[in-house]
Amino acid sequence: MQGQTQSISFDGREIRLTTGRYAPQAGGSVMMECGDTSVLVTATRSTGREGIDFLPLICDYEERLYAAGRIPGSFMRREGRPPERATLIARLIDRPMRPLFPSWMRDDLQIVATCLSLDERVPADVLAVTGASMATLLAGIPFQGPMAAVRVGLLGDDFVLNPSYREIERGDLDLVVAGTPDGVVMVEAGANQLPEGDVIEAIDFGYEAVCELIKAQQSILKDAGIKQVQPEPPTQDTKLSTYLEKNCSKSIGEVLKQFEQTKAERDSKLDAIKAKTAEAIDSLKEDDAVRKSVNANSKVLSNNFKALTKKLMREQIIKQGKRVDGRKLDEVRTITSAAGVLPKRVHGSGLFQRGLTQVLSTATLGTPSDAQEMDDLNPGPEKTYLHHYNFPPYSVGETRPMRSPGRREVGHGSLAERAIIPVLPPKDTFPYVLRVVSEVLSSNGSTSMGSVCGSTLALMDAGVPLKAPVSGAAMGLIKEDAEIRILTDIQGIEDFLGDMDFKVAGTKDGITALQMDMKITGLPVKTIAEAVNQARPARIHILEKMLEAIDAPRTSLSPHAPRLLSFRIDPELIGTVIGPGGRTIKGITERTNTKIDIEDGGIVTIASHDGAAAEAAQRIIEGLTRKVNEGEVFSGTITRIIPIGAFVEILPGKEGMIHISQLSEARVEKVDDVVKVGDEVTVRIREIDNRGRINLTLRGVPQNGEETQSEPAPTPVAPLN
């Protein structure tokens, strides 16, 4: 089981591709390694199914907790449903792979990437993407690769290739670029308001490294004596397509030129043309080749009709510069937006509409305990900003069962989440956990960017002090030979019939997120740069329209949102606040009707709908953690009496004891002869023993309050409004 290993080095990091050693019954397999991260990627092909008109490609990313030396925490101690990160990585594999398979291919294909070992310095996702290409080539599957992917980070002014997790967190850019010999085929990035020029430079920098990984794959194939299988389309009967071109081109073209019609009207007219054509074909002679072709496959007419519509729409854009709704290539659809559209029971809400795409976003403010723990191979910090995206069937006028979120919903939600994170306020000044939910009410293209815009409106309506508002736009592309047209703000039909879906989100100062997917085998960086630069005026225009609805975050929170106080205590005193078995902190929460969270670093966050109650809880905690010294004098209240003395609360939550011998200069027979529960007394700290117990005295202490010591009022870190 020796196998063959090819190594390539980037910035001191070595990537190793081992073939011929693992998973011998898979169509093709490769072990991708970098540092201590190991990902096994397999590609398998099986006989296609009858009657389908799409590529049945499945891409899975599997995490095994043993890869990080951990045992699952579930009852069965076994991995269960893939975590969100695994779903996103599976999409990251699928998106650059899918356009490289022949459009006519109908065989079942499955790519499985399994993370077997994880080095905390080396993310596994880009290794899985590159491995998918290598495994597919080794499996002899028709494929227009090789394809490879790398990650680019930005530390200071320097780009870093395949940065570690820590470098990603410290840097201003997290960009993944995938490409083929033909150009870039996929880009995904989160950025800290970077200028367009920096992002374009990063894509170019990454593509150079991609080319090196492509050469490594080609070298492995050559050394193994494997010839890459070139896609060869099956012979197709062109009689039906010729018939449709002759009989339908004029009527379809006329519909596409009716720029004032609605989407529903256009779809209805195209359906009518198709139905009339079907009737005409059905009236042909029984032995007519066109009729026999349609009768043999119920989907062949629909597929050929769509292909002709696509061809005519693309020709109209290339030759006339006209889109189906009459817009110019760089024109944005009509924008309307509103903030505060729901009652304030909902902490914040925003409604964003662009053309026929409409998104309702809501923002909810929560406490630190609402943060999401990341139960995956690289847990990292808890998530304190969550974005959830819902795409119900009625948004496209369809009916289907309502199910749990699929990969698409998870991916769109993650992109919108990524776009907003760079502008969120620092945790120490705004310690709320934030959840935004975007409900797609109507869809006609670019709902993910609509969700970004809706999120901004909802968060500002909720009173979240964003560093800057964020907007987003989706760019498209039509490529016919050397002719290229870039489209601004694509709608559904342009996404479906076009060659690119490029989403760009950001503020007026720069980009915060982008995602590019292709339907062709690659684009030069120069063309991508044109799309990025063309997106900027569209983003700014959309942002200006949004700011007409709300130009700054609200100055006050919803009356139904929790109020938070945040302050710091000595981490060594956390146990004092919590108490044995959590008794002390539970008593404080019950007494003040608040919710209290304490982080390991000593940051205490108190949540309550009543600001006064939160302040009371803060005073108790500060009293518990305040250091007192021998000789200090306090006014306190007798809280309980025992035979040998009395306990006095000298600070909120902090008690000391007066021994019976310290109650008076004279001999005392019974404690309650001198003091009773509820009495106000002035005491001096006589001693603090080695167990931290405070011993008090009344002897020699005047009871007129002159030597009492008052405590300053606490100053909250987070506002109470």
Swiss-Prot record:
Residue positions binding Mg(2+): D495, D501
What SUPFAM superfamilies does the annotation carry? Eukaryotic type KH-domain (KH-domain type I), Nucleic acid-binding proteins, Ribonuclease PH domain 2-like, Ribosomal protein S5 domain 2-like
Might you name a Gene Ontology BP term for this protein?
mRNA catabolic process
User: Where can this protein be found?
Assistant: Cytoplasm
Q: Which domain of life is it from?
A: Bacteria
Q: Which CDD domains match?
A: KH-I_PNPase, RNase_PH_PNPase_1, RNase_PH_PNPase_2
Keyword Transferase, does the record have it? yes
GO molecular-function annotation terms?
Answer: 3'-5'-RNA exonuclease activity; magnesium ion binding; polyribonucleotide nucleotidyltransferase activity; RNA binding
* Annotated SMART domains: KH, S1
Query: Catalysed reaction per UniProt?
Result: RNA(n+1) + phosphate = RNA(n) + a ribonucleoside 5'-diphosphate
Do you know which PROSITE patterns this protein is assigned to?
KH_TYPE_1, S1
Domain named KH: residues? 562-621
Record's family? Belongs to the polyribonucleotide nucleotidyltransferase family.
What this protein is called in its record is Polyribonucleotide nucleotidyltransferase
